[in-house]
């Protein structure tokens, strides 16, 4: 294990802390709710869903947070403004921790930022995300909101290398004229979480993990990713699972995906990750123990270098 020479930022969002030296703070774990084809969603256009089931999922993740000490975040996904604003209003009622405002629609993200500001729970919110494709309207909407935390994506489509990821944060890289960190500061973001933008195996997955070390070593900022997307985009695994299903081994096909899906989060955690977007919140009882165990291994080795884990670290709760 190692210790960074660079002083490491620790940020606090809705009572949860992220960052620091490896082995100091437990890894934050963010589960996604209301994602595409989530069985609890009854109408994804109007944002109608099973409230009891949604609350149960959020509460289960909260229980895992209490058990392991790993900070929990709720990644709230909605495909349009109406749905996303309904979803975040509900989550704010039943959860007092951090939540990510997430959508493939810029209009939905803008509506969510505005709603969170008007309703008074912007301090819980993490914008997802500031990246090279953000336009002026979305940027200005973020400026006018009360949101102070955001995922900052270090992805340059023109340069997927580790150097390219650092450059896009600092000066815009090969795609834009403004660095993402400068853009975040101008938008009023005080608490940046750097997403190293994991790409598929064979297309830069390894560089993404290495970028975690580079960002912390050079900038000292909290880093993480949605690394579970790596097995989801792995063609070989998809074909392997198909073969298992055709052979009547349906359960094994599911298990293989779960192992790779949860295992990917361990890779990011060992790669000096401070947070992981682990995928469906339904998997909380799989993700939390796996990452807590990884955090404990890191903390044990880091103690020899003088790093002291916080009281809520899994190593102080699960032994």
From Swiss-Prot:
**EC number(s) on file:** 7.2.1.4
Q: Which UniProt keywords apply?
A: Methanogenesis, Methyltransferase, One-carbon metabolism, Transferase, Translocase
One GO biological process this protein is involved in is: methylation
Task: Write out the pathway annotation from the protein's UniProt entry.
Answer: One-carbon metabolism; methanogenesis from CO(2); methyl-coenzyme M from 5,10-methylene-5,6,7,8-tetrahydromethanopterin: step 2/2
Question: What does this protein's UniProt record list under function?
Answer: Part of a complex that catalyzes the formation of methyl-coenzyme M and tetrahydromethanopterin from coenzyme M and methyl-tetrahydromethanopterin. This is an energy-conserving, sodium-ion translocating step. MtrH catalyzes the transfer of the methyl group from methyl-tetrahydromethanopterin to the corrinoid prosthetic group of MtrA.
Catalytic activity as recorded in UniProt: 5-methyl-5,6,7,8-tetrahydromethanopterin + coenzyme M + 2 Na(+)(in) = 5,6,7,8-tetrahydromethanopterin + methyl-coenzyme M + 2 Na(+)(out)
Q: Which gene encodes it?
A: mtrH
Recall the taxonomic lineage recorded for the source organism: Archaea, Methanobacteriati, Methanobacteriota, Methanomada group, Methanococci
SUPFAM superfamilies reported for this sequence:
Dihydropteroate synthetase-like (SSF51717)
Q: Is Transferase given among the entry's keywords?
A: yes
- Species this chain originates from: Methanococcus aeolicus (strain ATCC BAA-1280 / DSM 17508 / OCM 812 / Nankai-3)
InterPro entries given for it? Dihydropteroate_synth-like_sf (IPR011005), MeTrfase_MtrH/MtxH (IPR023467), MtrH (IPR028342)
What is the top-level taxon of the source organism?
Answer: Archaea
Q: What is this protein called?
A: Tetrahydromethanopterin S-methyltransferase subunit H
């Amino acid at each position: 294990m190692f210790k960074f020479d660079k002083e490491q930022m620790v940020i606090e969002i809705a009572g949860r802390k992220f960052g620091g030296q490896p082995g100091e703070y437990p890894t934050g774990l963010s589960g996604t709710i209301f994602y595409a084809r989530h069985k609890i969603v009854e109408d994804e256009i109007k944002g109608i869903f099973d409230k009891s089931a949604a609350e149960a999922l959020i509460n289960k993740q909260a229980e895992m947070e209490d058990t392991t000490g790993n900070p929990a975040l709720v990644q709230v996904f909605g495909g349009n403004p109406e749905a996303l604003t309904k979803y975040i209003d509900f989550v704010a009622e039943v959860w007092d921790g951090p939540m990510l405002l997430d959508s493939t629609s810029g209009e939905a993200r803008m509506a969510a930022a505005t709603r969170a500001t008007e309703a008074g729970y912007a301090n819980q919110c993490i914008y997802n995300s500031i990246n090279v494709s953000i336009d002026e309207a979305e940027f200005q909407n973020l400026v006018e909101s009360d949101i102070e935390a955001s995922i900052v994506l270090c992805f340059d489509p023109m340069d997927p290398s580790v150097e390219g990821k650092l450059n896009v944060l600092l000066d815009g890289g090969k795609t834009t004229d403004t660095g993402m960190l400068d853009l975040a500061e101008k938008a009023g973001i005080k608490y940046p979480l750097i997403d190293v933008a994991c790409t598929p195996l064979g297309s830069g997955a390894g560089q993404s993990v290495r970028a975690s070390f580079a960002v912390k070593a050079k900038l000292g900022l909290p880093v993480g990713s949605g690394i579970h997307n790596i097995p989801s985009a792995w063609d070989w695994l998809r074909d392997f699972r198909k073969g298992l299903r055709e052979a009547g081994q349906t359960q094994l096909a599911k298990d293989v995906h779960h192992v790779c899906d949860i295992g990917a989060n361990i890779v990011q955690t060992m790669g000096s990750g401070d947070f992981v977007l682990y995928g469906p919140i339904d998997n909380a009882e799989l993700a939390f123990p796996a990452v807590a165990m990884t955090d404990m291994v890191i903390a044990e080795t880091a103690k020899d270098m003088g790093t002291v884990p916080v009281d809520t670290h899994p190593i102080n709760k699960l032994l």
